């Protein structure tokens, strides 16, 4: 396991952006597999591989670039590594970024699932508030620790590891019709 971590760190040092995006996409896919197998109890025979591929695409092309880029912007908006700075970063993240990101994520997923604009709006009206409240139960303490203890280039990976559980929930919520 230590060798795997060293390899990951070496790749992060050499190709940080690519590794962050690949990590995000892969872990969004893992979250969907967990959602289908453990939450929805589909079984392997009924696993929707196309849905997992769609969720991975959202991870590769939306989650990874947007969240990875956001952490760079946030580090410039709120500087320093103090507890106070970590708290400020968490507040800006959870008040400014999380609501927008979550709405976009649910909307993109609905679009990729073939929902019309009207169906997508109705789904957002039905699911957004519940998903945002769930977000606030999980992410504030995770983000304070992330912003205080974790270097910028590892933040997306740390968040995505925690997010395997969150991605499972989001995949279930986003794909529930």
Swiss-Prot record:
One of its GO terms (biological process) is regulation of mitochondrial DNA metabolic process. Keywords: Membrane, Mitochondrion, Mitochondrion inner membrane, Transmembrane, Transmembrane helix. The record marks 93 as: Determines ion selectivity. This is Mitochondrial inner membrane protein Mpv17. It holds the Pfam family Mpv17_PMP22. InterPro entries: Mpv17_PMP22. It is linked to Genetic defects resulting in MPV17 loss are responsible for the transparent (tra) mutant phenotype. 'tra' fishes display pigmentation abnormalities and lack of cells derived from the neural crest, such as iridophores and, at later stages of development, melanophores. MPV17-null larvae show disruption of mitochondrial ultrastructure in liver cells with mitochondrial ballooning and disappearance of cristae, and impaired oxidative phosphorylation, insufficient pyrimidine synthesis, and mtDNA depletion. Belongs to the peroxisomal membrane protein PXMP2/4 family. Widely expressed. Involved in mitochondrial homeostasis, and control of oxidative phosphorylation and mitochondrial DNA (mtDNA) maintenance. Non-selective channel that modulates the membrane potential under normal conditions and oxidative stress. It is found in: Mitochondrion inner membrane. GO terms for cellular component: cytoplasm; mitochondrial inner membrane; mitochondrion. It is a multi-pass membrane protein. GO terms for molecular function: channel activity. The chain crosses the membrane at residues 19-39, 55-75, 95-115, 132-152. The keyword Membrane applies. Its main location: mitochondrion.
């Amino acid at each position: 396991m230590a060798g795997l971590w060293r390899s990951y760190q070496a790749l992060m040092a050499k190709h940080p952006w690519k590794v962050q995006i690949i990590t995000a996409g892969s872990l969004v896919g893992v979250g969907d597999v967990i959602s289908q197998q453990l939450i929805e109890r589909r079984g392997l025979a009924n696993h929707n591989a196309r849905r997992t591929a769609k969720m991975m695409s959202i991870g590769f092309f939306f989650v990874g670039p947007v969240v990875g880029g956001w952490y760079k912007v946030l580090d410039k908006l709120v500087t320093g590594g103090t507890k106070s700075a970590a708290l400020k970063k968490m507040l800006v993240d959870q008040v400014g970024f999380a609501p927008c990101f979550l709405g976009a994520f649910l909307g993109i997923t609905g679009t990729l699932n073939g929902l019309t604009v009207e169906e997508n709006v109705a789904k957002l009206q039905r699911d957004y508030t519940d998903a945002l409240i769930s977000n606030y139960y999980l992410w504030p303490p995770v983000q304070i620790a992330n912003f205080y203890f974790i270097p910028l280039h590892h933040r997306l990976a740390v968040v995505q590891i925690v997010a395997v559980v969150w991605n499972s929930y989001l995949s279930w919520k986003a794909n529930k019709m």
